[in-house]
């Protein structure tokens, strides 16, 4: 089995929740190709699923050392830092991911950073701008629905969820949110 096939197997195991075997594969990949970032990336993903944020950061830092132009590495490290409440490190990583390729996931995580930094109004304004600039990104509509719901604005939340449902009728999360309203 070549490197790419092993990597795909590790990612498949990760999706299935078999974290021990996915971690084993990540370590094998690192041993086989220590100059490739993907083995360390897989390790970082596994540790995120296990909520082992420091270990995830360590693995992602190694991945970034090897390949510093992949926005996903910065976004994931930023998310781990957000979980540890290292807010400024998280912000820097999200902004780097955005600078690299305008990562939609990093934009959403930057909204979470703003909320955790007690900048709720700034977060909402930022997300509304994202919706205006990219109205086809269903995840932005969902996140705005979540923010409105948490703010006690059920009617507004419902309109955001309904728009998300028009865009992605099979989205289970949106169906659940609308069913609870």
Region roles according to the model:
Residues 34, 68, 101-102, 135, ...:
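Short coil turns that delineate tetratricopeptide repeat
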Residues 15-16, 49-50, 83, 116-117, ...:
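Register position in tetratricopeptide repeats
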Residues 42, 76, 109-110, 143, ...:
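Canonical tetratricopeptide repeat
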Residues 3, 37-38, 70-72, 104-105, ...:
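Helix-start (N-cap) detector for alpha-helical repeat units in TPR-like alpha-solenoids
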Residues 2-38, 42-51:
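Alpha-helical segment of the N-proximal tetratricopeptide repeat
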